[in-house]
Regions:
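Iron-sulfur cluster-binding electron-transfer modules in prokaryotic oxidoreductases
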Residues: 1-132
Length: 132
């Protein structure tokens, strides 16, 4: 049922640090983001936030325990819906797709390391240091 290990392999080989959410919230026991079946619309916000609370709690756990600042998803609906839910439940948590994570990590020969992601947003950890 589904692809569980392949995305983890890609993520572990793309980012600096990888932490799993609690075991009872991942793989076959995962929680939905709460926005499937057309619920990713503004008028359904309260229902989306309630439905996404279990996922938000597991993200909050790794954020507080390990300082995780980004969650990567293979699901396009999660990628579209989680930023709003996590801004509410876990402020400051970034959301990316696995393909975005890989694209942002790729540095081709002769290319300088990126300071912004492919969307033009600052990459976490690559912000310019202010002059002291």
């Amino acid at each position: 049922m589904g692809l569980f290990e392949e995305p983890r392999y890609v993520i572990k080989n793309t980012c600096n640090h990888f932490y799993e959410m609690p075991e009872n919230t991942i793989r076959e026991q995962t929680f939905c983001c709460g926005s499937g079946s057309g619920l990713n619309a503004g008028e359904n916000m309260e229902l989306r936030l309630r439905g996404g609370l279990p996922r938000a709690n597991s993200v909050k756990y790794v954020h507080e325990k390990h300082g995780v600042n980004m969650v990567a998803c293979v699901c396009a609906i999660d990628r579209a819906a989680l930023p709003t839910a996590l801004d509410y439940w876990v402020p400051g948590m970034a959301v990316t797709g696995v393909h975005e994570l890989v694209g942002n990590a790729l540095i081709l020969e002769g290319e300088k390391p990126r300071e912004t992601n492919l969307r033009g947003e600052p990459l976490p950890g690559m912000e310019e240091e202010e002059d002291v």
